[in-house]
């Protein structure tokens, strides 16, 4: 410290130069937080795997939705305006495709226009980052004429609005924090100079910290979140001010004791500096332990550890400069010696706590337990609730919700990826089965894929419809045969009549052959009657075709015979002309009947072929779907395949629309049920070895829930173990760390319970924001441990008076220090309340409630009672070094 004081100006110049250079040349941390600060899931998360598959296939284009809200049902004039808008949007750089709500296809139109025709949806496929999406949205807003109301939304735009909201909240927090600290320090020190010293010291720490973090984030992908800067401000200014108060108070006391300013500074750092180092080191360890978290947004809290490390360096280098330069002027105009007087309230509570420890432990439990028992752990993953409804992306969501339902904006994307083509007639039917399985899950509104591109199944693909068509065809066959029979009966009668005429005229020459032909037709009619009956009773198409082919041959012979008879007649009697003409017509009738039978036979053959193909298809029994070759070649069906497949058919997608808010807890429950339903459905099918993953907002939130829950528990254990080791070494005890940490856990769970009551039960929020439990736990434990260190470190000094007296004296001396520090730290977090960001307000609430609860209840009631209960056991297993405390 003497060397630091000796070279104080050189050190100050280095700190100033370093701050200026870093501020000028380091990357902007705010911009980096906007770019990289979103909740980034690990690569093995289901939603990230879905994104990776689509990205590899070039199918990872972004999508935004333009929503038009009309006062009345859409008119021709508005449709013309929309066509012009669509043409202009297509010309914007970065726009890949615009799906027109004015499509000629009714199914598409129904999907993009509400039933009352007052809400029109226009999906726009784009490329680029979230920032690029925001730029495209701004250009679209400029295109929309003033007489139309349009809002634009999408995951990228919501992310950007959240980033802007957080940025605005940070600016408010910075200003309010500085004002609060100045106000509180004016009250504490009664000086117009002193309040600005912590502001300057912590200000340098903050500027250097955010510059170093910017360099780390930019160059080595150091974890960052949109909350990093806000927490950095609150924590650095909070504990930095506390530490400054600790050192400045001791410095002034030493000045009053007659020491010169240099010696007073040395003593202040030799005594108060020890406590500062221990407390700062504990906070540093607490936040550094978060580097073991798997989730990047949780790891981002390590940035606070960087800030705390810088703060410690600045406190030991820059603050001494002000002490030895200004001396007593640092406290101008106050002349009174500043020292915390004994806290009578804490002394009173301490005496009674050690006298009746069990009673005060019970009182602590009575105060905290009711709140803990009400805790439901209601967590919200709705990022749209984080920002004001004034943002256009949120207004667009509300418009979609009102016009189409909540799930329309962000459907679940089921991605199926295999090693072989999945768009064959043998595999597509299994997609139909998956669709049916998903549709049976509660809260699923519709499923769109190859077999049902608009959410409604293509009926002609299902064998019940196809068999119905075959049945209808066989009915028509029977009717066709009946028509042929009727025609042949007429021909038979005509031939018999002609046979009589020609027989009397020519002594039976031609008459005999005509009679034979008539007899032949009679027999054919009888055969047709049997065929018709057989089709009706058995549906045996193969045998029917053989019989009809034979009958057709017989009709051909009769036709040939009639043509020969016609030639014979033409050379005979005078009336032969009339008979010849009649015979010609009858011959043509036979020909027509034969052609009719051929058509009937062809129809039966087609039906027979379909039935044969069905019998050979392995999918019919499993799925009830059969896709004939002509359907696979159909233009519209090919379009459906192209729309829902990728990677040359090796990948397919299903789009699942829910009837609930895609950000809600209900949606997460639904997607988990969908996963189970799909897994059961593909078991034992050609798709069982395919990768099946899930993308979209709901899938991301499901991953977020699983990861945040497991990683929170894991990180909590790591942090507690780290603190336990540090505190064990510090206090040479394994008992003290246990009840110190237990008291902090009790404080945390009580505080989070009260916060849940306020925001969920009181303000009607869906739940506490998902990041709140983690960040509030980390901050409250890391900062709260400071105050227990303040108290127990003083207890080590006073324990020579006896355990009970040592506790009472420690509480008397440290009560005002701890309460003042807690109020200042709570004040810096209170500065987060006007931010308007739900997560920040809820974290601030937990910290404020926790600090006040810890300072007013847990430390003065619980800790002394526990110390008195353990007695000499407080130093187990190492034992107390008597006379050296």
From Swiss-Prot:
Q: What is its main location?
A: membrane
Q: Mind listing the UniProt keywords for this protein, alphabetically?
A: Cell membrane, Membrane, Transmembrane, Transmembrane helix
Q: Where is it located?
A: Cell membrane
The transmembrane residues are 9-29, 181-201, 202-222, 227-247, 278-298, 304-324, 354-374, 716-736, 740-760, 772-792, 817-837, 847-867
Sorted alphabetically, the Gene Ontology cellular component annotations on this record are:
plasma membrane
Q: What ranges does the record give for the region Disordered, renumbered to this chain?
A: 498-518
What name goes with this protein? Putative membrane protein YdgH
| Domain of life, source organism | Bacteria
Keyword match tRNA processing: no
Query: Record's family?
Result: Belongs to the resistance-nodulation-cell division (RND) (TC 2.A.6) family. MmpL subfamily.
The record's listing under InterPro entries reads:
MMPL_dom, Mycobact_MmpL, SSD
Source organism (scientific name): Bacillus subtilis (strain 168)
Q: Does the keyword Transmembrane apply?
A: yes
| Entry membrane topology | Multi-pass membrane protein
């Amino acid at each position: 410290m003497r060397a630091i004081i000796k070279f104080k100006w050189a050190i100050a110049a280095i700190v100033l130069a370093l701050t200026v250079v870093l501020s000028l040349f380091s990357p902007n941390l705010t911009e980096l937080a906007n770019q990289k600060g979103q909740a980034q899931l690990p690569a093995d998360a289901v939603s990230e795997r879905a994104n990776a598959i689509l990205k590899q296939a070039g199918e990872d284009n972004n999508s935004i939705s333009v929503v038009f809200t009309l006062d009345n049902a859409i008119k021709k004039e508005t449709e013309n305006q929309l066509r012009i808008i669509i043409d202009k949007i297509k010309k914007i750089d970065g726009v890949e495709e615009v799906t027109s709500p004015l499509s000629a296809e009714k199914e598409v139109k129904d999907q993009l226009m509400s039933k009352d025709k007052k809400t029109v949806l226009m999906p726009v496929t784009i490329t680029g980052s979230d920032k690029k999406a925001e730029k495209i949205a701004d250009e679209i807003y400029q295109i929309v004429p003033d007489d139309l109301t349009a809002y634009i939304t999408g995951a990228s735009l919501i992310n950007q609005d959240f980033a802007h909201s957080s940025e605005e909240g940070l600016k408010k927090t910075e200003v309010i924090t500085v004002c609060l600290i100045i106000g509180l320090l004016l009250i504490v020190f009664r000086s117009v100079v002193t309040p600005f010293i912590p502001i300057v010291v912590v200000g340098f720490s903050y500027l250097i910290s955010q510059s170093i973090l910017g360099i780390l984030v930019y160059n080595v992908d150091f974890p960052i979140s949109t909350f990093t800067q806000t927490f950095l401000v609150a924590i650095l200014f909070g504990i930095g001010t506390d530490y400054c108060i600790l050192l400045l108070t001791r410095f002034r006391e030493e000045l009053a004791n007659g020491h010169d300013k240099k010696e007073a500074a040395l003593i202040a750092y030799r005594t108060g500096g020890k406590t500062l180092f221990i407390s700062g080191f504990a906070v540093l360890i607490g936040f550094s332990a978060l580097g073991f978290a798997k989730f990047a947004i949780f790891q981002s809290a390590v940035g606070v550890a960087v800030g705390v490390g810088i703060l410690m360096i600045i406190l030991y280098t820059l603050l001494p400069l002000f002490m030895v330069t200004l001396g007593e002027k640092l406290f101008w105009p106050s002349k009174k010696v500043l020292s915390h007087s004994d806290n009578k309230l804490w002394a009173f509570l301490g005496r009674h706590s050690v006298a009746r420890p069990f009673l005060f432990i019970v009182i602590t439990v009575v105060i905290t337990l009711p709140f803990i028992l009400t805790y439901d752990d209601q967590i919200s993953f709705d990022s749209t609730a984080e920002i004001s409804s004034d943002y256009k992306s949120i207004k667009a969501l509300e418009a979609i919700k009102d016009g189409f339902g909540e799930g329309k904006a962000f459907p679940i994307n089921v991605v199926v990826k295999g090693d072989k083509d999945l768009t064959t007639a043998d595999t597509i039917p299994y997609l139909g089965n998956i669709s049916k399985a998903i549709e049976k899950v509660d809260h699923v509104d519709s499923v769109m894929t190859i077999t049902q591109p608009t959410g409604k199944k293509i009926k002609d693909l299902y064998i019940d419809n196809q068999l119905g068509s075959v049945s209808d065809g066989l009915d028509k066959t029977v009717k066709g045969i009946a028509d042929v029979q009727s025609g042949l009966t007429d021909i038979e009668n005509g031939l018999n009549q002609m046979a009589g005429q020609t027989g009397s005229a020519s002594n039976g020459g031609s008459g005999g052959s005509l009679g034979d032909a008539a007899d032949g037709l009679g027999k054919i009619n009888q055969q047709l009657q049997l065929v018709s009956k057989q089709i009706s009773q058995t549906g045996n198409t193969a045998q029917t075709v053989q019989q009809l082919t034979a009958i057709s041959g017989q009709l051909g012979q009769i036709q040939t015979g009639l043509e020969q008879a016609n030639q014979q007649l033409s050379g005979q009697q005078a009336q032969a002309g009339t008979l010849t003409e009649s015979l010609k017509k009858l011959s043509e009738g036979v020909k027509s009947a034969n052609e009719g039978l051929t058509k009937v036979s062809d129809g039966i053959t087609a039906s027979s072929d379909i039935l044969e193909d069905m019998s050979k298809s392995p999918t019919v029994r499993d799925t009830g779907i059969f896709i004939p070759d002509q359907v696979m070649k159909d233009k519209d069906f090919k379009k459906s395949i192209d729309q829902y497949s990728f990677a040359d058919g090796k990948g397919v997608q299903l789009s699942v629309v829910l009837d609930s808010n895609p950000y809600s807890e209900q949606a997460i429950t639904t997607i988990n049920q969908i996963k189970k339903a799909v897994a059961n459905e593909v078991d034992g099918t050609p798709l069982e070895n395919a990768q099946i993953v899930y993308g979209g907002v709901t899938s991301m939130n499901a991953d977020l829930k699983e990861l945040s829950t497991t990683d929170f528990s894991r990180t909590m254990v790591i942090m507690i173990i780290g603190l336990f080791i540090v505190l064990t070494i510090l206090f040479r005890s394994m008992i003290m760390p246990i009840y110190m940490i237990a008291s902090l856990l009790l404080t945390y769970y009580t505080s989070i319970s009260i916060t849940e009551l306020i925001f969920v039960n009181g303000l009607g929020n869906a739940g506490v924001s998902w990041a709140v439990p983690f960040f509030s736990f980390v901050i409250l434990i890391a900062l709260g441990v400071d105050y227990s260190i303040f108290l127990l470190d003083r207890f080590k000094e006073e324990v020579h008076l006896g355990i009970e007296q040592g506790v009472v004296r420690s509480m008397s001396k440290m009560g005002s220090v701890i309460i003042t520090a807690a109020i200042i730290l709570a004040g810096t977090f209170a500065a987060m309340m006007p931010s308007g960001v739900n997560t920040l307000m809820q974290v601030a609430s937990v910290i404020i409630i926790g600090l006040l609860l810890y300072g007013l209840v847990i430390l003065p009631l619980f800790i002394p009672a526990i110390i008195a209960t353990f007695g000499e056991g407080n130093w187990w297993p190492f034992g107390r070094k008597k006379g050296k405390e």
